[in-house]
């Protein structure tokens, strides 16, 4: 009997050792934002682990440094906004691939808020986008997703970026602090920051940017080396697709034209609160939209590059076939059944 137990124990330890050896670490660059919820859900629910992937989350303060870190080989996967910096890294000869959806600015789904000083709102000084003319508006960096989004919103309203004083403040927390300290009149920041400004009484959400201009703001992108390891890259995407579906069914469900809590809503709220450090009631203000299976709005990526070229932030647009690869997400969708 003892001999049998010893054999069984050795077999169990060997199996555990094999499983540990098969679990492949992947460094993933992310921001502590509500839009990163699918990544957080995938980690907490073990969806990546189910396919032998152990994500190591590396947190950043803004989107552009994630692209730089990916190019430098400090991370293998980036999950954040599409910036001019990312496109320019590719133009400079580095290879990376945009592979999946990680968030869209979409009507009815809060992501980036245009937030104004509460005092200016109460005085009636800023009540619309057109009232931003001549005002100081803070954002992370020039060439950021916020820069692109603000420019396109202004153009729809008959304004130009030159009609405002755009102030780059490098990181999201410092952008919020600038509004609090009245160094700027308005800011553009993603959830949970808009909700926090209102909860603390110094900010007022003027509008949700996705209600004014819809686009593919954020994606998952792979570094050259990671993409070359096809099996590992597809396995990561399998976990991501599973997490994306879970996220979608929990927090993006609509009924009669309104977003309503779906299955596992409270669980996803708690997971997101844990990783962002925001209170659950702030998280509940809303989650950004993304495709249930993680599929990209590919034509929108081309539109973005055209805009950056027109505004002097890129020398030329990159052919989509040289920067977008949807084969990873399509392979994962086929492999991960409902």
Where are these regions (language model features)?
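Loop-centered beta-sheet repeat module
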Residues: 167, 171-203
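Conserved C-terminal helix/tail region of periplasmic/extracytoplasmic solute-binding proteins
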Residues: 301-338
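Short, glycine-/small- and polar/acidic-enriched structural segments
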Residues: 22-161, 165-169, 185-191, 206-214
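Short, hydrophobic alpha-helical packing/hinge segments within bilobed ligand-binding/sensory domains
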Residues: 66-67, 85, 174-178, 194, ...
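Bacterial N-terminal signal peptides
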Residues: 7-16
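Periplasmic-binding protein-like
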Residues: 103-113, 198-226, 237, 244, ...
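Secondary-structure end/capping motifs
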Residues: 228-315
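Bacterial N-terminal signal peptides that target proteins for export
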Residues: 1-6
């Amino acid at each position: 009997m003892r001999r049998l137990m010893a054999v069984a124990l050795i077999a169990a330890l060997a199996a555990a050792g094999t499983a540990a050896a098969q679990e492949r670490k992947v460094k993933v660059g992310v921001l502590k934002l509500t839009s990163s919820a699918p990544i957080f859900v995938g980690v907490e629910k073990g969806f990546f682990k189910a396919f032998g992937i152990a994500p190591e989350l590396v947190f950043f303060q803004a989107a552009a440094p994630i692209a730089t870190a990916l190019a430098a080989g400090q991370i293998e996967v980036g999950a954040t906004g599409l910036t001019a910096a990312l496109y320019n890294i590719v133009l400079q000869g580095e290879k990376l691939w945009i592979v999946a959806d990680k968030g869209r600015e979409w009507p009815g789904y809060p992501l980036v808020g245009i937030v104004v000083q509460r005092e200016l709102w109460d005085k009636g000084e800023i009540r619309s986008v057109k009232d931003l003319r001549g005002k100081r508006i803070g954002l992370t960096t020039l060439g950021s997703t916020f820069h692109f989004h603000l420019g396109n919103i202004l153009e729809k309203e008959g304004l130009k970026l030159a009609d405002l004083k755009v102030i780059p403040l490098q990181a999201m927390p410092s952008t919020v602090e600038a509004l609090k300290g009245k160094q700027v009149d308005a800011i553009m920041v993603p959830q949970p920051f808009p909700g926090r400004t209102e909860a603390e009484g110094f900010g007022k959400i003027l509008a949700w940017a996705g209600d004014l201009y819809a686009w593919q703001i954020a994606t998952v992108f792979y570094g050259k080396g990671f993409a070359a390891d096809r099996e590992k890259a597809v396995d990561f995407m399998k976990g991501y697709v599973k997490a994306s579906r879970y996220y979608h069914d929990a927090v993006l469900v609509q009924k009669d034209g309104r977003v309503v809590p779906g299955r596992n809503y409270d669980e996803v709220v708690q997971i997101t609160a844990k990783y962002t450090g925001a209170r659950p009631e702030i998280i509940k203000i809303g989650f950004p939209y993304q495709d249930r299976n993680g599929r990209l709005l590919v034509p929108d990526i081309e539109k973005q590059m055209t805009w950056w070229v027109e505004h002097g932030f890129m020398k030329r647009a990159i052919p989509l076939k040289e920067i977008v690869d949807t084969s990873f997400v399509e392979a994962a969708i086929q492999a991960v059944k409902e």
